Amino acid sequence: MVAGKVRVTMGFHKSPSTKKTKDMPSPLPLPPPPPPPLKPPSSGSATTKPPINPSKPGFTRSFGVYFPRASAQVHATAAAASHNGVVSELRRQVEELREREALLKTENLEVKLLRESVSVIPLLESQIADKNGEIDELRKETARLAEDNERLRREFDRSEEMRRECETREKEMEAEIVELRKLVSSESDDHALSVSQRFQGLMDVSAKSNLIRSLKRVGSLRNLPEPITNQENTNKSISSSGDADGDIYRKDEIESYSRSSNSEELTESSSLSTVRSRVPRVPKPPPKRSISLGDSTENRADPPPQKSIPPPPPPPPPPLLQQPPPPPSVSKAPPPPPPPPPPKSLSIASAKVRRVPEVVEFYHSLMRRDSTNSRRDSTGGGNAAAEAILANSNARDMIGEIENRSVYLLAIKTDVETQGDFIRFLIKEVGNAAFSDIEDVVPFVKWLDDELSYLVDERAVLKHFEWPEQKADALREAAFCYFDLKKLISEASRFREDPRQSSSSALKKMQALFEKLEHGVYSLSRMRESAATKFKSFQIPVDWMLETGITSQIKLASVKLAMKYMKRVSAELEAIEGGGPEEEELIVQGVRFAFRVHQFAGGFDAETMKAFEELRDKARSCHVQCQSQTHQHKLCFRSTPC
């Protein structure tokens, strides 16, 4: 500093380098660009060397001689200090830049992570939405399950109350039965035995549920002739003996069961069937397949006692004596195929019917004469056939599935566990069943259904065993068809016209009955085409399905029905006795029905032929009378003056 002051006083200016070094330490607000490298001063003379003036060379050289070296050293120290300050400032700025660089790198990394997280956000949002939907569904399911649980709890409480009521009712009924037994025990021995058995049956009725009754109603074999058991015999004897108190008691007891609700019936029936199923069922032996038994069952099945042909009544003896002359006409028809030889009764029935050409000729002549009349309306037969099909389908349909409840399932499980030997016995009997006569199939199917009705639910229990379902169904199908046809034959043979009834209603009834017979034959022919092979494979007889089998009995019954029809028409013609359109309409109606039956049955027997001849004679006399009346009217018209 001393040297500087000296220079100022002597008129020397500061060197630019010195000014630069003095200005360097000033602080910078912003980091400036790096300054150019400074030359470190080696000595004070080198740093502050003034420019050489050529005009004063000597003065300059001599001027350096006059100043000592101490001033130069002081100036160099100050410059070094200022340079160190600049370096430290630069270092500080470099550190700040490095810190900012690290901060920017961190921010860049955060930005990258943010971008990656942003790309994942839509997927996460969709997953969150799905989970929220699942949570809502689970909440709804939980609410629904809670409602179901509450409803089932209420139903369970109601069923418990009903069960307790049923138990109290059973106890009361048992007490009443015990009292009645005590009263009955004081009577005579025979009467006491029958009454005790009857009240034992009443106790069984009170123990059995409506479920088993409904299951028994499933099969259409409920119309089959019931085998008469000891229990039923005793019941019949009691009813005939006139025990009015027991009858009233039984009616009231049955009505009380019929009025109970479905839930009560199900609960009671399930619990009682579970208790009953604890004891294994001891099956009854199947019916024997013998001729005597077949005849006896046949006699029991059909009210008219006949051995050869149960349904149709036998004709009186005179026609049988008059019948031997026409065998040649029977030989004209082609004989039936010879599979199994038909029974004697069937051959006799076929021999009674022969073709009568007069019926066809008279019918065609009448149709030509009365061509203006409308043709037969066939809609009635179609409706009757449709009703018959609907009735059969409704009769064979199963009752709706029983509600899926724990007591019901427990009863089924109990039957499966306890009735195994019983069901295996039935499986063996069905598998080994082989028949040569259809009359043996009907009682066997009836016995099988009676045994299966002991189970709580036949289908639900049998599906746990190797049940021969196809063979059992084939046996039922054959028995149903045969029994339905026998029932039709019996109905036609037992038909009795009431003279007090109007002719139109009586004739309509006979027409409807004939249409049933006709439909039965047609359905049997369709069944023969489709089920004959199946029946043969299961060893079920098929000879009854042939034309020489039950079809001949149906045709004979239709011939008898035609005889009654023509007799009723003849009686109506005698009652009219006035001629006119009513009489002609009756004649046309009777001849049409006779022709239809003649074509269906293949002919008439002797009695029916007599009835037809009587109708034909009356028709001819009526026609002659009408022609004479018409002729008289014409003569009167001509004789009348204009």
UniProtKB/Swiss-Prot annotation:
One GO molecular-function annotation for this sequence?
microtubule binding
Region listing for Disordered, in residue ranges: 1-60, 223-351
Start-end of Basic and acidic residues biased regions: 247-256
Point to the regions of Pro residues compositional bias: 26-40, 302-344
Q: List the keywords (alphabetical).
A: Cell membrane, Coiled coil, Cytoplasm, Cytoskeleton, Developmental protein, Membrane, Microtubule, Stress response
Expressed, tissue-wise, as follows: Expressed ubiquitously at all development stages, with highest in developing petals. During mechanical stress, accumulates in granules on microtubules.
Q: Per the UniProt entry, what is one GO biological process?
A: cotyledon morphogenesis
Name the residue ranges with Low complexity bias: 258-277
State what the entry records as the consequence of deleting this gene: Reduced interdigitated growth of pavement cells, with smooth shape. Long and narrow petals and cotyledons, as well as increased anisotropic cell expansion of petal epidermis in the late phases of flower development, as a result of increased microtubule ordering in petal abaxial epidermal cells and in cotyledons pavement cells. Enhanced cortical microtubules (CMTs) response to mechanical stress leading to aligned arrays. The an-t1 ipga1-2 double mutant exhibits stronger phenotypes than single mutants in term of longer and narrower cotyledons and leaves.
Q: Which GO terms describe its cellular component?
A: cell periphery; cortical microtubule; cytosol; microtubule; plasma membrane
Q: What are the coiled-coil residue ranges?
A: 80-183
Q: What is its main location?
A: cytoplasm
Q: Which domain of life is it from?
A: Eukaryota
The protein's location, in the record's own words, is: Cytoplasm, Cytoskeleton; Cytoplasm, Cytosol; Cell membrane
Give the record's membrane topology: Peripheral membrane protein
**Which purpose does this protein serve, as stated in its record?**
Microtubule-associated protein involved in the regulation of anisotropic petal and cotyledons growth and shape by affecting cortical microtubule organization. Prevents cortical microtubules organization into parallel arrays oriented perpendicular to the axis of cell elongation thus limiting anisotropic cell growth in the late phases of petal development.
Q: Which family does it belong to?
A: Belongs to the IPGA1 family.
What does the annotation say about its assembly with partners?
Associates to cortical microtubules via its N-terminal region. Interacts with ANGUSTIFOLIA (AN) on microtubule upon mechanical stress to regulate microtubule organization. Binds to the microtubule-severing enzyme KATANIN (KTN1).
Protein's UniProt name: Protein INCREASED PETAL GROWTH ANISOTROPY 1
From which source organism is this entry?
Arabidopsis thaliana
